[in-house]
Amino acid sequence: MLFRKVSVIRGRVLTPSGQGLRGVRVSNGLALREGFTLTRSDGHFDILVTGGGPVKLKFGKSPFPYQSRNLFVPQNQVMNIFLYKFK
């Protein structure tokens, strides 16, 4: 990861009823070497990614199926994404 391109994506994962979902694994499916994060007890997460290009956020927690969301992330930015509901 080039430090001059580092960006942060912040977001929140919710259950279908609107509650924050703890322990969801969030990763960049296009750059698995960048690691992953887990959502906190209120469903919020922060993940460090290489900015300046596409990111495929992958969300996973049993018993829910894995889901993904494609984003373009500018470099050197903190990006807040919309609430994400597990189905």
Q: What residues fall within each predicted segment?
A:
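Pro/Ala/Gly-rich low-complexity, hydrophilic intrinsically disordered segments
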Residues: 1-5, 82-87
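Beta-strand-rich domain onsets/edges
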Residues: 1-22
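Surface-exposed coil/turn segments at beta-strand junctions on protein surfaces, enriched
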Residues: 2-4, 38-40, 48-52, 72-74
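Intrinsic-disorder/low-complexity, polar/charged segments enriched in Ser/Thr/Lys/Arg/Asp/Glu/Gln
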Residues: 6-10, 42-44, 78
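Residue-level detector of beta-strand face positions
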Residues: 12, 25-27, 58
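Short, acidic Ser/Thr/Gly-rich low-complexity loop/linker segments typical of extracellular
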Residues: 22-23, 28-50
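A short, solvent-exposed loop/turn motif at the edges and junctions
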Residues: 29, 50-86
